[in-house]
UniProtKB/Swiss-Prot annotation:
NCBIfam families listed in its UniProt record: gatA (TIGR00132)
Protein name: Glutamyl-tRNA(Gln) amidotransferase subunit A
GO CC, any one term: glutamyl-tRNA(Gln) amidotransferase complex
Subunit (UniProt): Heterotrimer of A, B and C subunits.
Active site per UniProt: K77, S152, S176
Tagged with keyword Protein biosynthesis: yes
Keyword list, A-Z: ATP-binding, Ligase, Nucleotide-binding, Protein biosynthesis
Catalytic activity: L-glutamyl-tRNA(Gln) + L-glutamine + ATP + H2O = L-glutaminyl-tRNA(Gln) + L-glutamate + ADP + phosphate + H(+)
Single GO MF annotation: ATP binding
GO BP annotations, alphabetical order: translation
Family the entry assigns: Belongs to the amidase family. GatA subfamily.
Organism of derivation: Streptococcus sanguinis (strain SK36)
Protein role: Allows the formation of correctly charged Gln-tRNA(Gln) through the transamidation of misacylated Glu-tRNA(Gln) in organisms which lack glutaminyl-tRNA synthetase. The reaction takes place in the presence of glutamine and ATP through an activated gamma-phospho-Glu-tRNA(Gln).
Amino acid sequence: MTFNHKTIEELHDLLVKKEISAVELTQATLADIKEREAAVDSFITVSEEEALAQAAALDAKGIDADNLMSGIPLAVKDNISTKGILTTAASKILYNYKPIFDATSVEKLYGKDMIIVGKTNMDEFAMGGSSENSYFKTTKNAWDSSKVPGGSSGGSATAVASGQVRLSLGSDTGGSIRQPASFNGVVGLKPTYGRVSRFGLIAFGSSLDQIGPFSQTVKENAQLLNVISGNDPKDSTSSQEEVPDFTSKIGQDIKGMKIALPKEYMGEGIDSKVKETILAAAKHLESLGAIVEEVSLPHSKYGVAVYYIIASSEASSNLQRFDGIRYGYRAEGIENLEDVYVKSRSEGFGEEVKRRIMLGTFSLSSGYYDAYFKKAGQVRTLIMQDFAKVFEKYDLILGPTAPTVAYDLGSQNQDPVAMYLADLLTIPVNLAGLPGISIPAGFVDGLPVGLQLIGNHFDEATIYQTAAAFEATTDYHKQQPVIFGGEK
């Protein structure tokens, strides 16, 4: 028996009425994972034993009728710490690492009696846009196994898109939730920087990283964000801002909503069919009463360059802790202390991670700091100011999530710069610390296209309101890949 076509509210109803137990729902989810895993390779670890034990304890305690998430299974990206469950960040250097603590976001999941069924595959240390940089396996797109799933949260996206789980958590440093959501036709949101605690997230770029939800529908996405949001004394960058009910505006119409369409988001490098799909989505929002107008974000063209200096610099610092001494992989044939560091890091890190550590170390080095890192910080401020100016007059910004649909596996491995440029539409949102969502908006050559909606700081509720209005009047989110029972 499978329950993966049922919404969270429908599953909650079944659990409360005792038509199914938490153990039965967890067993069904584990069966869905096993059945589809060979086709998509979403998971690094399936935590069957822990999940079933948790479900059994919940059945003994009883489902809380007032807690929508009680007994709901989900998957978690493998760079989010889970006590006693392997957390590798898809790296050889952490191949055997079991944290002794839970990330705050995981604590919040457990606090709502949610059941973690496994840890999803990703690009190593979240560095990449295709999930091909994993030490363990290559995740495949849920719609076409010859295509990339996007990255770095590829496994979290394919787990939802293929019907293995209804919900998952990912992390987004430069588009790592939104781009795989776009490539797999699911809903993925990067919250405002500081909305969700980063404590327990294995750091890549500390001023950019943010944990966020994947789901089948907009409402379920908001329901999961309700669980994981809030201030955390363990994360000094987590916000004191009050957490609203993110579902509160869902169902409200969008008449008079002012939406900006930056001309830079529809320019050079954007596939013509993707552009047509997004313009059609903009027209559809206009038909619902929104006002869509063209604007300019002049400094967004520098976003990719700025991002790769800042993110790589932060990574070169953050990844110094993986030294072969405290935990994780240690090379053999060691003769002295320097050997421990050099060999363990050389053998333990993959090529892309080493590339970014070198780039970041160079950007921070004496003589280049002013020309690169300092300058990147100044341009980042200009990018933030561009957004602030637009949000003085507009409620949201609209554009494609990615410039293309999913591309062939292996096609960009030898050209890292081409892969970096694929994030040009998502990166500015991280640089400015803004919230952004990707929702299904159509298909090009049988592959999903994501519509990106960007909101002002801490205004996720307006993003969800507009995304839900679009979803309620289109059927793109109802179209499923063959692996999930869709039509060929």
